[in-house]
Amino acid sequence: MANCVRCCCWLLVLMLMALAITAAVVFVRYKNGEGVFPFPGVPGAVDHKYADALAVALQFFQVQKSGKLVNNTIHWRGDSALDDGKEAGIDLSKGMYDAGDHMKFGFPMAFTATMLSWSVLEYGDAMRAADQRDSAIDALNWIMDYLVNAHPSDDVLYIQVGDPKADHKCWERPEKMKEKRPLTKITPKSPGSDVAAETAAAMAAASLVYKTINKTYSSSLLDHGERLFAFADKHRGSYTRTFPELSAFYNSTTYQDELLWAASWLYHATGNHSYLAYATGKNKDFADLGNPRYFSWDDKRAGTEVLLSRVSFFASQGSDVAQDDVLGMYKQTADAVMCILLPDSETAAFRTEGGLLYVAEWNSLQHPVASAFLAAVYSDYMQSSGKTELSCSGQGFSPADLRKFAKSQADYLLGSNPMKISYLVGYGDRYPEKVHHRGASIPEDVDTGCDGHKWLETSKPNPNVATGALVGGPYKNDSFVDERDNVMQNEATTYNSALVAGLLSALVSTSSLARSLS
């Protein structure tokens, strides 16, 4: 009897050792870009460089908050814009200021929420390992409360608070604002499919985040998302065609990409195949499949292609979804997007000498950060689904190659660049000190109104640090001028922060992704 017990004990020990060795081998293979990391996946060791940067990046959302602040962690910020929306009988006091001004632009704010949600959905475990998930959800909640209130009925969406021309003439702290803040709304007679669909995407994505946190809130968000999508699709038109004066700020080139983007998110949120059919049916022409694009607040096509590729990557073999030719075309286009991002690919896009993917002069960091996030996500889709190779003009690349590209862009913005400067304010020993930001540039004890331009014009560093701000970034020659009036390079935006938070979350640790976002 004793011998049997000893045998069983040794057998158990051997089994545990075998499991440990297997897990170690799989983990090493994953780290080297090989094999499949097991589901459901546990975050690997935390990379503290990216975790620390993530903690910094998320603080900018606290800097940008409007309304009655709760648990405020930014000593130089206070309550502001408490009467926003009052003229329409709604509460639009929450939400976030767009950049260094005090405008609430609904289009980029909704995109900010969509990207925050996507990041939490894919990398919530990594965020939790870095103790930052709650911070991300707090920022998301502040925006979603605003967006819900901005949609008081099926065919009405308030898309803007403030007059941008009047706002930009003032240089003042948000807490001291006394100017009128008019409201702009879209209706069936004044359409804005782009901003309505982006808001629908934000609602759908956020509903997935809150599904395990607050089911009632999640259901409400999804209801708003479905109604907004119906509104956007039925009453088609671009908001910057309806309101031409707004084209100088966030000009929407087309609303078609937002309709596909929203339908894709609604499919993930509901499982309703009618939304997938919307993107793969006659509306597929909106995607311009076969022609890779860069992802941004204006152009959602690359994001949609990656998001729908998720369906293909994790579909059961032989299923209708797995055999869908149009979904296959979305994935092929997503492959092509990845190929232009990889520096050793034949179709590689232009890089600066310092290694930054360079697409646009204004806010030059937006495209490389957005692209790096997509590359990290795509790498993890490949890794988690067992796909080991991406073919670019016959040349093979691994998931590790995509992750290496994503890291290179993150490292550049964190200081590994010719200027030896971190473009993430508050991270590292050297970062921009004269960020184009009204609140940061004016001492908190100064009682100034709209005429505080001396704080814009001073050569001194900002008295308040806009921690977490990701500024516009360098020129094509990797140079950067840290001056407050250098709006092109030295202004930060909330959507930049959402993008960099997503990228850093992807790099915090290694883990597999869930097969379903729901």
Curated annotation (Swiss-Prot):
GO terms for biological process: cell wall organization; cellulose catabolic process. GO terms for cellular component: membrane. Keywords: Carbohydrate metabolism, Cell wall biogenesis/degradation, Cellulose degradation, Glycoprotein, Glycosidase, Hydrolase, Membrane, Polysaccharide degradation, Signal-anchor, Transmembrane, Transmembrane helix. GO terms for molecular function: cellulase activity. It is a single-pass type II membrane protein. PROSITE patterns: GH9_1, GH9_2. It comes from the Eukaryota. Its EC number is 3.2.1.4. Residues 57-518 are extracellular. The chain crosses the membrane at residues 36-56. It is an enzyme of class 3 (hydrolase). Glycans are attached at N71, N214, N251, N272, N477. This is Endoglucanase 18. It comes from Oryza sativa subsp. japonica (Rice).
